[in-house]
Amino acid sequence: MTSTAPGTPEPGTDPADPRTVVVRYVDAVARGDLEAVRASFAPDATWTYPGDVPLTGVYRGRDTIVDEFLLGAGVLFAPGGAPAVTLTNVIADGGQVVAEWTSKGLAATGRVYDNACLGVFTVADGLITSVREYADTQHVERSLFGGPQPG
């Protein structure tokens, strides 16, 4: 799995730098490093996933984000079909970081999951305090939950 796109600048050397924190988090997701993923979040962090699919909601607290949202999404993939996550763009301004990534894998439904995602991260004191994730939720519904195909 690739965690940074060719040409994407490497994160800074300060481990608390917001851009570095987000790049390190996405890299941990791509590697499947659950310990590093969990350590990326503040204890009271929030993750907002808008839309009207079963994953939609506001997840409050580091453990809820990891155990219910991230691991909950993980079981929607076929055995051995865990998505490959590729970071494609990162823009940072102070404590705000916008990251784009692709996620591709085989869903438990037998359908291919291939989505472009965007997250607006807030980072403070070297930890992610909030994320607002945007993705094609119609594709999420069709591929991960077996919703009707277009056409």
Predicted regions and their residues:
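A beta-strand edge to alpha-helix "cap/lid" segment located at domain peripheries
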Residues: 2-14, 70-151
